Amino acid sequence: MSQLTSSVRVDVKTEYIETQSSPDEDKYLFSYTITIHNLGSDDVTLKRRHWCITDSNGRKSEVHGTGVVGETPTIKPNSSYKYTSGTVLETPLGVMEGSYTMVDSNGDEFKAPISAFRLSIPGLLH
């Protein structure tokens, strides 16, 4: 999954973490690895994140916060920043989507949207 906005491209890869999940207790742990590419000619800094997480029962949760994994990275032109985080769902299927608030070298804010991506245990969907 990939989203391109302005000079920023966001790629997402997900993984079900079976060893830390407990389906009998409705606990499904997923990791997601995000790569943010700066395709522009100026530095960009990730300031804030916003996630909307929905499980297959329609339960929604929102996450707002400063930076990602404790950092507010500045990404140089033609470079990327990669991190891994995770979320727990009560169902074996869900979706996440959101956005990053970025700041360019002029101090102007812009949103880098993150298209919806699926969180699913292996073999659930074809």
Curated annotation (Swiss-Prot):
Signal peptide: none annotated. It comes from the Bacteria. Residues 2-126 form the ApaG domain. InterPro entries: ApaG-like, ApaG_domain, ApaG_sf, Uncharacterised_ApaG. SUPFAM superfamilies: ApaG-like. NCBIfam families: PRK05461.1. This is Protein ApaG. It comes from Shewanella halifaxensis (strain HAW-EB4). The gene is apaG.
